[in-house]
């Protein structure tokens, strides 16, 4: 009987109650707020990291571009322009022949300008590009006012390349230098040169002045050499020489045989 009693006592003994920890009213809300703050902080950090990575990639790309040689940059730009032209060809398949030629001329002109900017980056091409278009220069016939020519519209007076400027020179110089013997030509030439170079930078004007000084020195040497030659020729022409017309012979006559007697002096 004793063991059964012990069993009953063990069964009747209940475990001690667990005292539950009392929660404060704001404890759950603080946990939620902390989780929100942590989420916001992590989002800000991710944005900062993304911006930093983007800035780093951009800086690396710029550094890589700067390391490229000028020739590489030119080739890349040419390739880009060719790709753009090919894209335009595919988009403008319906254009006529005249439009296609005009587009190709414009593309070639833009490519030449870009090439010049790449090769001569220190030259202010924007200043030349932004210069106002030339005014109309109309020359009319005095006897027939209806006969007029706008020189500014002629392709000759719209040079853009070295060969085109050379053509302007070879066209105008023969027309102008034919007047060089006229009294007003020298004064006109001085004013003409000033007007030609007044819009150029001082460095270019200095180079032009130096070339004129060199030309002046060469002309002075030529003139001095010519003066010396003329003086020698003139001296040779004006040299006095004794010219005798009588034959050179020995006089054998005696002065005593002159046919006069002593009494003739009396």
Curated annotation (Swiss-Prot):
Q: Which Pfam families match?
A: eIF3_subunit (PF08597)
Kindly list the GO molecular function terms attached to this UniProt entry: translation initiation factor activity
Q: Where in the cell is it found?
A: Cytoplasm
* Composition bias type Acidic residues, residue spans: 26-44, 86-97, 254-266
Look up the domain of life of the source.
Answer: Eukaryota
> Where is the region Disordered?
1-111, 217-266
Give a GO biological-process term.
Answer: formation of cytoplasmic translation initiation complex
Residues in coiled coil: 40-82
Comp. bias intervals (Basic and acidic residues): 45-61, 73-85, 98-111, 218-230
Q: What is its main location?
A: cytoplasm
Keywords recorded for this protein, A-Z: Coiled coil, Cytoplasm, Initiation factor, Protein biosynthesis
Q: Name one GO cellular component term.
A: eukaryotic 43S preinitiation complex
Role, per record: Component of the eukaryotic translation initiation factor 3 (eIF-3) complex, which is involved in protein synthesis of a specialized repertoire of mRNAs and, together with other initiation factors, stimulates binding of mRNA and methionyl-tRNAi to the 40S ribosome. The eIF-3 complex specifically targets and initiates translation of a subset of mRNAs involved in cell proliferation.
Q: Which family does it belong to?
A: Belongs to the eIF-3 subunit J family.
User: What binding partners and quaternary form does the record give?
Assistant: Component of the eukaryotic translation initiation factor 3 (eIF-3) complex.
Q: What name does this protein carry?
A: Eukaryotic translation initiation factor 3 subunit J
Q: Which organism is it from?
A: Aspergillus niger (strain ATCC MYA-4892 / CBS 513.88 / FGSC A1513)
């Amino acid at each position: 009987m004793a063991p059964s009693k012990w069993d009953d006592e063990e069964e009747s003994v209940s475990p001690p109650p667990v005292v539950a920890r009392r929660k404060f009213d704001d404890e759950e809300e603080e946990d939620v707020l902390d989780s929100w703050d942590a989420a916001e902080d992590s989002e800000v950090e991710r944005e900062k990291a993304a911006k930093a990575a983007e800035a780093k990639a951009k800086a690396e790309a710029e550094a890589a571009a700067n390391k490229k040689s000028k020739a590489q940059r030119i080739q890349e730009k040419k390739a880009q322009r060719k790709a753009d032209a090919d894209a335009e060809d595919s988009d403008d398949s319906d254009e006529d022949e005249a439009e296609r030629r005009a587009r190709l001329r414009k593309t070639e002109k833009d490519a030449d300008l870009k090439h010049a900017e790449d090769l001569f980056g220190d030259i202010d091409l924007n200043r030349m590009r932004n210069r106002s278009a030339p005014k109309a220069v109309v020359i009319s016939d005095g006897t027939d006012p209806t006969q007029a020519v706008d020189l500014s519209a002629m392709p000759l007076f719209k040079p853009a390349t070295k060969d085109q400027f050379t053509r302007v020179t070879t066209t105008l110089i023969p027309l102008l230098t034919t007047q060089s013997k006229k009294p007003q030509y020298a004064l006109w030439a001085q004013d003409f040169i000033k007007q030609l170079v007044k819009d150029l930078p001082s460095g270019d004007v200095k180079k032009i002045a130096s070339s004129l000084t060199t030309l002046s020195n060469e002309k002075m040497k030529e003139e001095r050499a010519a003066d010396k030659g003329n003086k020698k020729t003139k001296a040779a022409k004006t040299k006095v020489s004794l010219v005798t017309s009588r034959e050179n012979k020995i006089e054998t006559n005696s002065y005593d045989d002159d046919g006069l007697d002593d009494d003739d002096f009396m």
